[in-house]
Swiss-Prot record:
Signal peptide: none
Keywords: Cytoplasm, GTP-binding, Initiation factor, Nucleotide-binding, Protein biosynthesis
Location of this chain's protein in the cell: Cytoplasm
Nucleotide-binding recorded as keyword: yes
Gene Ontology MF term list: GTP binding; GTPase activity; guanosine tetraphosphate binding; translation initiation factor activity
G2: annotated span: 491-495
Protein name: Translation initiation factor IF-2
Region (G1) residue spans: 466-473
Domain of life: Bacteria
Length: 959
C-alpha cells in the first residue's frame, strides 16, 4: 500500500490478498495433538475473552456471524496483513443501535455448531466487497484503532430492518418447530396403536390356528380309533421306515462320548442336515416340501450347533415330520392367492367336485355296487359330429371312436357323420333315437288348428283387380272418401294398398292391386290373400289382357268374383258388351243367367257404390267367414319397404289370431319384435285382429312381398327359423347362378348364354313389390344377344355402398321412387356412375330398352351394284397387275366391295384399289363402258374372270 498517503483513511484491499477482519476479543494458539504410531497434528485453538460492562453502560449487541465450514488454520497466516483493517471496521461499527439485548458469551470451539441467533450481518454496506467477511462484534470506544467510515442513516435503517426480519423468522421457526413436534408425537402414537393392533390380530390368528390344529388332531385320533387296520398298516410302515435324517446311528465299539470335531467343520462322511422350520410342525399336518426346509433369514449357527452336539455324542432328537394338511372346503373358499402362498403350495390340487366324485366311486366300489346304464332319447339331425353325438348320449367320445375302430373306421371327434351312422352308434350304446330333419324347425308354426268354440265372425277381405286405367283405385277412393290416385305417379297404382271401410256397421277390408302387366306377381298375391275378388271392367273398354289375367288368378285362388262395370257415365259405355265378352272367359253374370254378381257403378260420380258394398256383404254372409282371435297371429306380407326414419316397415294382413306390440314374429327369412302397429289411417293401435291390415315396425330386415308370417314363442326360435330360410335362399341362388350341368344340349345353351352381352344394373325402389315387378319386366326384354343383369336390388334409398358396387361392376343405378343421399351423389359424381330416377314404370322400361338396344351389334346389309368382265390383264411397273374390264351389268363404284368369280366360284373378296378410265381416276363406271381395275393386296387375276361389285351398309337394331 505504498501508493497511499498517511492521511488517507479509506479502506483499500490488495487484489492479491483476501480481505479478512480480526475477531476482537479472540486469542489464537496452537496445540499439538499426539496420535498412535508416532503421528502428531497441529491444531489452532481460539480463546474468546469475556467482556465485562459497567452497570451504567448499555450492553452492545454482538452481531452473530454465520458459521463457516472453512478451516480456522488459515487465520494466523493472514492476521498480520489485515490487522489495521479489522480494527478500523470494528470502530466503524461502534455507533450502530442495539435494539436487542444479547449477553456476550464465549464462542464454542467448533465452528460448525448450529447458531440459533438471527444473522444480523447479512445486509452488507454497498462499499463492501462480496469477498469480504461479515461484520464482527464492535469494540469498546476506549480501545484504539483506525476509524474508516461512519454508518449512514440508510445503512442503519437497513440493519434495523434486518434485525426485525430475523426476529420474525425466529418466531416463525419456533412455531413450526412446535407444530412439527406435535405432528411427530401424533405419528408416534398412531404407529404405536397400529403395532398394538397388529400384535393383537397376530395373537388371535395364532390362537385360531392352534384351535384348528387341535380340532384336526382330535378328529384324526377319532378316525384312527374307528379304523384300526389302516393304523396298524401305518405303524408297520413306520417301523420299516429308516432312521430320521440327521440322527446318527450308534456304531459298535465306539463310545457315545467320542472326540468332538471343530464346530465349524462338518463331520466326514455324513452330510449336514438341513434346518427345519420349528413352527411348521404343530400347525401343518403334512411333510413339508423341500422349498420350505430352510426358513428365510435363518443363520447357519443352528446347523453348526446341532452338528456339534451330534459329534459330541449327545443323543439327537429325531425330527418329527408333521402330516400334510389337506385344506377343507372352508379354507379353499376363502382367502386370497398371493405369491408366497402359491410358492408354498405343492401344486394344483383336485377340485371339490372331483374329490366328491372320487369318494362316491370309492363308496360304490366298497359296497360292490354297479352303476346302471341310463338309456336316453337322442335327437339326431341329418348330419352330426362325433363330439356332439357323444354329448347327446352322455358318453365319452373315446368310447365311440373305439367302437368305430372295431368296425374298421378311423375317425376323429370332429368328423361329421350322417344320420344313419349316428343311429347305429346310438342304438349300439343302448339309446333310443329320434330322427329330425332341418326343415322340422318350421313345424307347428303355420296351419295350427283353431279352437272351434272360440270362433267369431270376421270381416271379409276383398281384392280389387282389373286392367290398368279401368278405375280400380278411383273406385276404392270413392268408397273410402279419399284421393289416392292423385298421389300415384302417372295416375297408375304401383303398390298394393290395403284399407278397411265400414258399411252398415260391418267392416270390409279392401286390397288394391296394380293393373299394369308388370305387376303380375302382385295380382297373384292379392288373389291368394283374399276372400272375394271384385273384377273392375271399364264399360267403354271391355275385357283387356290384364282383365283376363285377373280372372285366371281369381279362379286359381278359388275365390268368388263380383263384376263391377265401371265408367257407365261415359257416352261410349256399353255394359252389355262387357257381359258378353266375359262369357268367353267362363264368367257368367246374373244378368246373363249366371251366378256371378254384377254391379254397374261410376267411381267418378259415385253411382251405385252402396249396391256394390251390399253385394260384398251378401257374398261374405254366404261364405260364413270366421276366425279365432285368441290364438297366435298368422298372416301374409302384402308389401314391405325400408323407411329412412322408421326402418323396415311391412304392410301385413292378419288372417288368424290377434297381433300385439311386443310379439316376436317370423316373416320369410326375417324376424323381429313388433314395436308398433299402424292402421291404414296412420293411427297407432293396441292390437290387430283377423282380416285387419296394419303396418308393423321392428323387423330386422325387409321381407319379401307375399311371405307368410307367424308369431313364435321366443327369439331363439325366430332366429333359428330365419337362419334356416336364409340358408335355403342362398343355396337356391348358388344353384341358379351355377346353372344346370349334364346333357350336351344344356352345355351348348350355357355356351350360347356366355356369349350374350349383359347390361348391368343396380335397382333400388321404395317397396319390394315394385322392385320385383321391375325385375320381371326387364327379364322379358332380354334376347339371345343381350340381357339385363341385376347386380343388386333392394328397398330403400341409394347409398354409398350401392355406388361402390356399381363402380366395381360397371353398372348403372336406377332409383324407383327413391333418391340418393348427398354422400352417394358425391361419390357417383367422382367415379362417373350414372344415377337415373323414375317414378313411372313405363319410362323406366323404355329407357332400359333403348340402352340395351345400343348393345346390339348392327345389322350388315349388302346392296348389289353390278358386274364387270376382265378382258385383258396388264403388268404395270410399281403398281402390279391391272385388269382391263368392261362393265356388263349395273355400275362399279370406287371403294366398293368386290368379289372375283372364276368358273362360278368366288376365289377372292376384297376392295377396289383403283378405278380408272383413260388414265383418269373416276368415281364410278356405268354399264357398257370399259375401265381399269386393281385390287387391294391381290394380283391373281386372269382374263375371263368376272368381278362382282357391291355396297355394305350397317343398320342399327332395336329390341
Amino acid at each position: 500500500m505504498s501508493d497511499k498517503t498517511n492521511d488517507d483513511k479509506t479502506l483499500s484491499v490488495n487484489p492479491k490478498k483476501t480481505l479478512t477482519l480480526k475477531r476482537p476479543g479472540v486469542e489464537q494458539s496452537t496445540v499439538r495433538q499426539n496420535f498412535s504410531h508416532g503421528r502428531t497434528k497441529a491444531v489452532v485453538v481460539e480463546t474468546k475473552k469475556r467482556k465485562f460492562s459497567r452497570p451504567d453502560e448499555k450492553p452492545e449487541v454482538e452481531a452473530a456471524a454465520a458459521p463457516k465450514p472453512a478451516a480456522p488454520a488459515a487465520a494466523p497466516q493472514q492476521a498480520p496483513a489485515s490487522a489495521p483493517v479489522s480494527a478500523s471496521a470494528a470502530q466503524a461499527s461502534a455507533p450502530q443501535p442495539a435494539p436487542v439485548k444479547a449477553p456476550a458469551t464465549k464462542a464454542p470451539a467448533a465452528p460448525s455448531a448450529p447458531v440459533t441467533k438471527p444473522h444480523v450481518a447479512q445486509q452488507r454496506p454497498v462499499h463492501q466487497r462480496p469477498g469480504g467477511q461479515q461484520a464482527q462484534r464492535p469494540r469498546p470506544a476506549d480501545r484504539s484503532g483506525m476509524v474508516l467510515n461512519t454508518l449512514s442513516r440508510s445503512e442503519m435503517d437497513a440493519r434495523r430492518r434486518a434485525l426485525e426480519e430475523a426476529q420474525i423468522r425466529e418466531v416463525e421457526e419456533r412455531a413450526r418447530a412446535v407444530e412439527e413436534a406435535k405432528r411427530r408425537a401424533e405419528e408416534d402414537a398412531r404407529r404405536a396403536k397400529e403395532r398394538e393392533e397388529s400384535a393383537r390380530r397376530q395373537a388371535e390368528e395364532e390362537a385360531r390356528l392352534k384351535a384348528e390344529a387341535e380340532a384336526r388332531r382330535k378328529a384324526e385320533e377319532e378316525a384312527a380309533k374307528r379304523m384300526p387296520q389302516p393304523e396298524a398298516r401305518s405303524e408297520r410302515r413306520d417301523d420299516a421306515r429308516p432312521a430320521p435324517y440327521g440322527a446318527r446311528p450308534q456304531q459298535a465299539g465306539r463310545p457315545q462320548g467320542g472326540r468332538p470335531q471343530p464346530a465349524g467343520r462338518p463331520q466326514q462322511g455324513s452330510p449336514r442336515p438341513a434346518p427345519i422350520i420349528a413352527d411348521a410342525a404343530p400347525i401343518a399336518g403334512k411333510p413339508l416340501p423341500q422349498s420350505q426346509l430352510r426358513k428365510p433369514g435363518q443363520s447357519d449357527d443352528d446347523d453348526d450347533r446341532r452338528s456339534g452336539a451330534a459329534r459330541r455324542g449327545v443323543a439327537a432328537k429325531p425330527e418329527v415330520r408333521a402330516p400334510k394338511v389337506v385344506k377343507g372346503e372352508d379354507d379353499r373358499r376363502r382367502g386370497k392367492l398371493t405369491l408366497t402362498s402359491n410358492l408354498e403350495e405343492e401344486g394344483r390340487s383336485r377340485s371339490l367336485s372331483a374329490m366328491r366324485r372320487r369318494q362316491e366311486k370309492f363308496k360304490r366300489s366298497q359296497m360292490q355296487e354297479t352303476r346302471e346304464k341310463i338309456s336316453r332319447e337322442v335327437t339326431i339331425p341329418e348330419t352330426i359330429t362325433l363330439q356332439e353325438l357323444a354329448q347327446r348320449m352322455a358318453e365319452r367320445s373315446v368310447d365311440i371312436i373305439k367302437y368305430l375302430m372295431k368296425q374298421g373306421q378311423m375317425m376323429k371327434p370332429g368328423d361329421v357323420i350322417d344320420a344313419d351312422t349316428a343311429q347305429l352308434i346310438a342304438e349300439e350304446f343302448g339309446h333310443t333315437v329320434k330322427r329330425v330333419a332341418e326343415s322340422d324347425v318350421e313345424e307347428g308354426i303355420f296351419d295350427v288348428a283353431d279352437n272351434e268354440s272360440a270362433m267369431v265372425s270376421r270381416p271379409p277381405v276383398v281384392t280389387i283387380m282389373g286392367h290398368v286405367d279401368h278405375g280400380k283405385t278411383s273406385l276404392l277412393d270413392a268408397i273410402r272418401h279419399a284421393n289416392v290416385v292423385s298421389g300415384e305417379a302417372g295416375g297408375i297404382t304401383q303398390h298394393i294398398g290395403a284399407y278397411q271401410v265400414v258399411q252398415n256397421g260391418q267392416k270390409i277390408t279392401f286390397i288394391d292391386t296394380p293393373g299394369h302387366a308388370a305387376f303380375t306377381a302382385m295380382r297373384a298375391r292379392g288373389a291368394q290373400a283374399t276372400d272375394i275378388a271384385i273384377l273392375v271392367v271399364a264399360a267403354d273398354d271391355s275385357v283387356m289382357p290384364q282383365t283376363i289375367e285377373s280372372i285366371n288368378h281369381a279362379k286359381a285362388a278359388g275365390v268368388p268374383i263380383i263384376v263391377a262395370i265401371n265408367k257407365i257415365d261415359k257416352p261410349a259405355a256399353d255394359p252389355q258388351k262387357v257381359c258378353t265378352a266375359l262369357l268367353q272367359h267362363e264368367v257368367f253374370v246374373e244378368s246373363m243367367g249366371g251366378e256371378v254378381l254384377d254391379v254397374e257403378v261410376s267411381a267418378k260420380n259415385k253411382i251405385n257404390l252402396d249396391k256394390l258394398l251390399d253385394a260384398v256383404l251378401l257374398q261374405a254372409e254366404m261364405l260364413d267367414l270366421k276366425a279365432d282371435p285368441d290364438r297366435t297371429a298368422e298372416g301374409v306380407v302384402i308389401e314391405a319397404q325400408l323407411d329412412r326414419g322408421r326402418g323396415s316397415v311391412a304392410t301385413v294382413l292378419i288372417q288368424k289370431g290377434t297381433l300385439h306390440p311386443g310379439d316376436i314374429l317370423v316373416a320369410g327369412s326375417e324376424w323381429g319384435r313388433v314395436r308398433a302397429l299402424v292402421n291404414d289411417r296412420g293411427e297407432h293401435v293396441k292390437e290387430a285382429g283377423p282380416a285387419m291390415p296394419v303396418e308393423i315396425l321392428g323387423l330386422q330386415g325387409t321381407p319379401q312381398a307375399g311371405d307368410r308370417f307367424a308369431v313364435v314363442a321366443n327369439e331363439a326360435k325366430a332366429r333359428e327359423i330365419a337362419e334356416y330360410r336364409q340358408r335355403l335362399a342362398r343355396d337356391k341362388a348358388v344353384a341358379r347362378q351355377s346353372g344346370a350341368r349334364g346333357s350336351l344340349e344344356q352345355m351348348m345353351n350355357q355356351l350360347q348364354v356366355s356369349g350374350t352381352k349383359e347390361f348391368p344394373l343396380v335397382i333400388k325402389g321404395d317397396v319390394q313389390g315394385s322392385i320385383e315387378a321391375i325385375i320381371n319386366a326387364l327379364d322379358k326384354l332380354g334376347t339371345d344377344e343381350v340381357r339385363a343383369r341385376i347386380v343388386h336390388s333392394g328397398a330403400g334409398g341409394i347409398t354409398e355402398s350401392d355406388v361402390s358396387l356399381a363402380e366395381a361392376s360397371n353398372a348403372a343405378i336406377i332409383g324407383f321412387n327413391v333418391r340418393a343421399n348427398k354422400q352417394a351423389r358425391d361419390s357417383a359424381e367422382q367415379q362417373g356412375i350414372e344415377i337415373r330416377y323414375y317414378n313411372i314404370i313405363y319410362d323406366l322400361i323404355d329407357d332400359v330398352k333403348a340402352a340395351m338396344s345400343g348393345l346390339l351389334s348392327p345389322e350388315r346389309r349388302e346392296t348389289f351394284l353390278g358386274n364387270a368382265e376382265i378382258l385383258e390383264v396388264f403388268n404395270i411397273t410399281k403398281v402390279g397387275k391391272v385388269a382391263g374390264c368392261r362393265v356388263t351389268e349395273g355400275k362399279v363404284e370406287r371403294g366398293a366391295g368386290v368379289r372375283l368369280i372364276r368358273d362360278n366360284v368366288v376365289i377372292h373378296e376384297g376392295k377396289l384399289k383403283t378405278l380408272k378410265r383413260f388414265k383418269d381416276e373416276v368415281a364410278e363406271v356405268p354399264s357398257g363402258q370399259e375401265c381399269g381395275m386393281a385390287f387391294e393386296n391381290y394380283d391373281d387375276i386372269r382374263a375371263g374372270d368376272v368381278i362382282e361389285a357391291f355396297r355394305v351398309e350397317h343398320v342399327s337394331r332395336t329390341l
